[in-house]
Amino acid sequence: MAIRKMKPITNGQRGMSRLVNTDLDNVRPEKSLTVPLKSAYGRDNYGHRTCRDRQKGHKRLYRIIDFKRNKLDIPARVESIEYDPNRTANIALLFYVDGEKRYILAPKGLKKGDMVMAGSQAEIKPGNALKIKDMPVGVQIHNIELQRGKGGQLVRSAGTAARLVAKEGTYCHVELPSGELRLIHGECM
């Protein structure tokens, strides 16, 4: 997966980069994991117009992403790596051995056909999800929970990664891409 740097033709494009999606699977999204996405037309939650020239844009389907990764110790096979119009990161369709299908954020290095797993039995490799206390210090992580069982809230964008700096009792020090050090409970995934 290559990253293309944009030329600074306009101020909005200065420093901008895009993923070159040459190795994505050209398949339809899983119908059971998509819902229609209603456009805001430049309105806020009261219905007041906040952006005068904002229109509907291209029709999109929202892909339901599994940010919690709560199917523990059940292996899954990566069926496809797909484009998601609603986020900068690509997504991976997982087929679990019990027959369930779920989308996850696709980390760098995940390929079609790989086996992934969430839980304490999982090894350290792209696509697996473990509790922060079970990871070695210095490893790069993404999709980090702030509260146990709430689902990933930090470091979900494409190309970003946080680093586990230290473990101290029940809490762990995580360095975010901004350079900020956060204390996160070791039971979080």
Spans of features found by a protein language model:
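Beta-strand/loop nucleic-acid-binding surfaces
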Residues: 99-111
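Short, structured beta-strand/loop micro-motifs enriched in basic residues and often containing a Trp
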Residues: 95-102, 120-126
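Basic, glycine/proline-rich low-complexity segments that contact nucleic acids
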Residues: 1-87, 108, 112-189
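Short, flexible active-site-proximal loops enriched in glycine and acidic residues
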Residues: 85-92, 102-104
